[in-house]
């Protein structure tokens, strides 16, 4: 996370110190990644205990690579690709050959690496491959927009994977290729409203840390750039972060009253 912030600050300020630190971190991981043993026998994860955590952090490495693209020489970026990003992609592609929330995260992470390094074949495999993003969404989301693994918390979790991918695809001018999948993801964030109890709490049928509530203003605010909602925009206008600096949220639409309520 700090590496991403340093890369962002370099883009914002042009200060070489931020560039040197972020690029130095990428150099370190590239130089050592293949020297580190996998965390567990028979599992390819090297930086973390499981490939899910590798995936959720790989998107940060990909973002740093994108942010520094115009400031780092091509040979250095190629070393990052060859010695860090591509080995991570191979590790993620070797597991989770199924429709699953972890598989979706892993394919989304690989797709973001593909965008960062300009690898069309990698992109096509992550999106349209046998266990790619399209199949994950087509088979993993029910007709009433719930993730099939029966945890309501997974709705937001897989939507966050697609939010990360949608943001990267939008920056690369390729969000239109994912228009259906992103629309489904937005509905994943909204569908729990249909199941909430009168006090806003949600049922907890499966894997969850505790009783959640709907709507979740924080999640909707984080998602406004790709999944704009009235409540999300209302929350986002009060936030000061990288997203709202680059893409200030518009005023939310007014919610008019129906004639019967007047």
Residue ranges of model-derived segments:
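Aromatic-lined, polymer-binding surfaces characteristic
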Residues: 1-186, 196
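Carbohydrate-active enzyme catalytic cores, enriched for enzymes
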Residues: 111, 153-262
């Amino acid at each position: 996370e700090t590496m991403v912030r340093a890369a962002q600050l370099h883009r914002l300020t042009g200060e070489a110190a931020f560039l040197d630190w972020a690029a130095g971190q990428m150099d370190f991981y590239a130089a050592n990644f293949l020297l580190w043993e996998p965390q567990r026998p028979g599992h390819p994860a090297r930086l973390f205990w499981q490939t899910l955590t590798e995936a959720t952090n790989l998107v940060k490495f990909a973002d740093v690579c994108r942010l520094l693209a115009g400031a780092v020489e091509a040979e250095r970026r190629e070393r990052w690709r060859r010695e860090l990003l591509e080995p991570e992609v191979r590790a993620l592609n070797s597991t989770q050959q199924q429709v699953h929330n972890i598989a979706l995260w892993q394919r989304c992470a690989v797709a973001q690496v593909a965008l960062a390094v300009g690898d069309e074949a990698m992109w096509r495999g992550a999106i349209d491959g046998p266990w790619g993003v399209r199949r994950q969404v087509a088979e993993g989301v029910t007709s009433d927009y719930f993730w099939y693994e029966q945890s309501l918390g997974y709705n937001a979790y897989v939507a966050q994977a697609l939010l990360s991918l949608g943001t990267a695809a939008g920056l690369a001018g390729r969000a239109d290729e994912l228009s259906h999948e992103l629309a489904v993801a937005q509905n994943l964030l909204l569908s729990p409203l249909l199941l909430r109890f009168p006090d806003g709490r949600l049922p907890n049928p499966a894997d969850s840390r505790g009783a959640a509530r709907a709507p979740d203003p924080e999640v909707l605010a984080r998602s406004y750039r790709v999944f704009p909602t009235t409540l999300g925009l209302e929350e986002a206008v009060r936030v000061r972060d990288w997203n709202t600096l680059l893409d200030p949220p518009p005023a939310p639409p007014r919610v008019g009253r129906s004639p019967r309520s007047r």
